[in-house]
Regions:
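Interfacial/gating helices of multi-pass transporter permease domains
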Residues: 5, 63-66, 100-107, 111, ...
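Hydrophobic alpha-helical transmembrane segments
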Residues: 9, 38-87, 254-260, 273-294, ...
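Interhelical loop/hinge segments that connect adjacent transmembrane helices in multipass membrane
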Residues: 63-67, 81-122, 167-177, 297-312, ...
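Alpha-helical transmembrane segments of polytopic membrane transporters and translocases
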Residues: 75, 110, 125-127, 139-157, ...
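Alpha-helical transmembrane segments of multi-pass membrane transport and lipid-handling proteins
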Residues: 1, 5, 10, 157, ...
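Helix-loop junctions and terminal segments of transmembrane helices
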Residues: 30, 146, 150-176, 180-186, ...
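Membrane-proximal transmembrane or re-entrant/amphipathic helices at the cytosolic face
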Residues: 301, 321-361
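Helix-terminus/linker motif at the lipid-water interface of multi-pass membrane proteins
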Residues: 58-59, 116-152, 167-170, 202-212, ...
């Protein structure tokens, strides 16, 4: 890795501590100790702030202090979870199960290159922009800022996945109906959120970045659209997890990574930086379509294809209208966003009513 001289040992310790904390958190979540998980989340946030203040403000150790603060916070979290959940009772070093270990490795090994493929989709955009275009490094800096809105979608998805994965594994009765219903609500939330964020794209960048970086808004719409299908593809990856078919996860991710590299080379030369954003969207769309097809043999889920197609068409139209700055683009984009809201309102309203009923009980 570039610019990591002298930090390799620290990075290894960071990975060890971070994964140890994640292991404890997953184990506690599997034991259905959700309140403890919530308390740990709050404490981890507080300790992260305190350690950052300690290393950066008090001790003034420089940028490496951010990494040290994260390590210290994760270590405290792991110790807290191990002690509060009494995980020592579940730790039996002498009861090694070789057969179970082989099963776990067979499932886990394809996940490593699969994750690398997702990183290729992200990093290849920057690599191609920086090297194929004139003033590529400057344009890549703008492209980096354009990920800001798409990252909001990813944060929402990560919060959802934290709660969703456990339910996906434990909910066995009526699983197909359960997955279909959750997917319908999830795609509604994703498309409504994306339509609203695309509509607010220009004012967001006017406030969020300086004047020199304002033009980054032009590349954000297609990246936001790509984030939607990245999240939907991640949802379908849960089916692979439930059925222990991680090899299919690797196959679809690899196809997306190859597609992204090819499209980047073609579209960036044709469209400029927005070619990279469009390539990202099309790559995530390919991953979603492949997963929607090959998960049919694992779990017959209702994707509501017509609704999905209309949502996509409205959002693509909104993105194109905004990027092309057509006359009265604000009005037309607002109408597209309103169409997405109207199309998905029923599912969200039903979910809200159900949550309110549970709360009253």
């Amino acid at each position: 890795l570039p610019n990591t001289e002298g930090y390799v040992a620290t990075l290894y310790f960071y990975l060890l501590i971070s994964n140890g904390r994640r292991l404890c958190a997953q184990f506690v979540r599997a034991k259905d100790m959700l309140r403890l998980v919530a308390v740990d989340g709050i404490l981890t946030s507080l300790t992260a702030v305190l350690f950052n203040v300690l290393f950066l403000v008090v001790l003034k150790v420089g940028p490496i202090g951010v990494l040290w603060a994260t390590m210290a916070s994760d270590f405290c979290s792991a110790v807290f979870l191990f002690w509060a959940a009494n995980l020592r009772r579940n730790l039996h070093l002498r009861r090694y199960d070789g057969r179970l270990m082989r099963k776990m490795l067979a499932y886990a090994l394809p996940l490593v290159p699969s994750l690398m493929c997702w990183n290729v989709i992200y990093s290849s955009d920057h690599l191609f922009v920086a090297n194929l275009l004139e003033n590529g490094k400057e344009l890549d800096g703008l492209f980096y800022y354009s990920y800001s809105i798409a990252s909001i979608m990813q944060v929402v998805a990560s919060i959802f996945n934290e709660a969703w994965q456990l339910s996906a594994v434990t909910e066995e009765e009526g699983r197909e109906r359960f997955f279909s219903r959750v997917f319908g609500i999830y795609q509604g939330v994703m498309f409504i959120g994306a339509a609203g964020l695309v509509l607010l794209c220009r004012p967001f960048f006017a406030v969020y970045v300086n004047e020199a970086s304002y033009e980054a808004w032009r590349y954000s719409p297609f990246l936001t659209l790509g984030a939607v299908y990245s999240c939907l593809g991640g949802f379908l990856n849960t089916i692979y997890m439930v059925k222990k078919r991680s090899g299919l996860s690797l196959m679809t991710s690899a196809a997306g990574a190859v597609c992204n590299c090819v499209l980047n080379f073609v579209l960036i030369l044709w469209m400029g930086v927005n070619g990279a954003a469009l390539a990202t969207f099309l790559s995530y769309l390919l991953i979603f379509v492949m997963r929607a097809v090959n998960t049919r043999g694992l779990l017959r889920m209702d994707y509501s294809p017509l609704k999905l197609a209309v949502n996509t068409a409205l959002l693509v139209t909104e993105c194109v209208l905004l990027i092309c700055e057509v006359p009265l683009w604000g009005l037309w984009c607002s109408l597209c966003a309103a169409g997405v809201l109207a199309l998905n309102f029923g599912d969200l309203y039903g979910m809200a009513r159900q949550l309110l009923r549970r709360r009253r009980r």
